[in-house]
């Protein structure tokens, strides 16, 4: 599933084509994705100019003039691609947000087509989703904080609001395993399995450790929590700079792959040597709450 860096990469890839363009028509090729489209969705967005693209957690936000926002989630296999100019057979489109190594975009899975008119001429932004776990919704910008998909989300790992003092308030007294606490979207919005594993390895912290052990008796963050916060922010920044992780379906807006997977230190490296200097441990895989966790039992305590 696309995580925050992948969705950020998709947003940045789509923005040059979509921002400022007129959304001439929304072509829905089926009545639903994971959920039904909102009633009158196509008519509601047609003829509106796209003001900006933004992101909240793992959600792509397409902001329209007039105060409406299209909320899009890529699910497990969703991707966008851009086709520019007149429709021509055999055109080679750019792919702004898939997710594995190059995979053919079977047109039978093209479920939504946004027909645009921008400064460089007509374009089509096509949403392709073989498994149909993605979805789209339409909401008023003024009501986003209370939207069912967005309310209760925690701080973004890319902003200054995520600091050790904030995490201390969330972790104090918790016996919950550290990995589970970090995956709680009410604490950190958009942080997923891959990057939690990597941040914990960089911090030398076991995913099985109780979250509350990183907070002192006065509720203040211990040095380990301060370091963990810095590592979380760093691993997300590194992944965004690399264009995400090409694990299952993620491809950048220009069709190239994300390359952060080449920087994985523990994720998906079960049985391989730990990359911590001086550590002679081996990366292990365990299952926590139904999710694979990769870590080094030797150096992560």
UniProtKB/Swiss-Prot annotation:
Binds 1 zinc ion per subunit. It catalyses: Hydrolysis of DNA containing ring-opened 7-methylguanine residues, releasing 2,6-diamino-4-hydroxy-5-(N-methyl)formamidopyrimidine; 2'-deoxyribonucleotide-(2'-deoxyribose 5'-phosphate)-2'-deoxyribonucleotide-DNA = a 3'-end 2'-deoxyribonucleotide-(2,3-dehydro-2,3-deoxyribose 5'-phosphate)-DNA + a 5'-end 5'-phospho-2'-deoxyribonucleoside-DNA + H(+). InterPro entries: DNA_glyclase/AP_lyase_DNA-bd, DNA_glyclase_Znf_dom_DNA_BS, Formamido-pyr_DNA_Glyclase, FPG_cat, MutM-like_N-ter, Ribosomal_uS13-like_H2TH, Znf_DNA_glyclase/AP_lyase, Znf_FPG/IleRS. DNA binds at residues 109, 131, 174. The active site is at residues 2-3, 58, 291. GO terms for molecular function: 8-oxo-7,8-dihydroguanine DNA N-glycosylase activity; class I DNA-(apurinic or apyrimidinic site) endonuclease activity; damaged DNA binding; zinc ion binding. Signal peptide: none annotated. One of its GO terms (biological process) is base-excision repair. Keywords: DNA damage, DNA repair, DNA-binding, Glycosidase, Hydrolase, Lyase, Metal-binding, Multifunctional enzyme, Zinc, Zinc-finger. Its EC number is 3.2.2.23, 4.2.99.18. Pfam families: Fapy_DNA_glyco, H2TH, zf-FPG_IleRS. A zinc finger (FPG-type) spans 265-301. Disulfide bonds: none annotated. Its cofactor is Zn(2+). Belongs to the FPG family. Monomer. Involved in base excision repair of DNA damaged by oxidation or by mutagenic agents. Acts as a DNA glycosylase that recognizes and removes damaged bases. Has a preference for oxidized purines, such as 7,8-dihydro-8-oxoguanine (8-oxoG). Has AP (apurinic/apyrimidinic) lyase activity and introduces nicks in the DNA strand. Cleaves the DNA backbone by beta-delta elimination to generate a single-strand break at the site of the removed base with both 3'- and 5'-phosphates. This is Formamidopyrimidine-DNA glycosylase. It comes from Rhizobium meliloti (strain 1021) (Ensifer meliloti). The lineage of its organism: Bacteria, Pseudomonadati, Pseudomonadota, Alphaproteobacteria, Hyphomicrobiales. The gene is mutM.
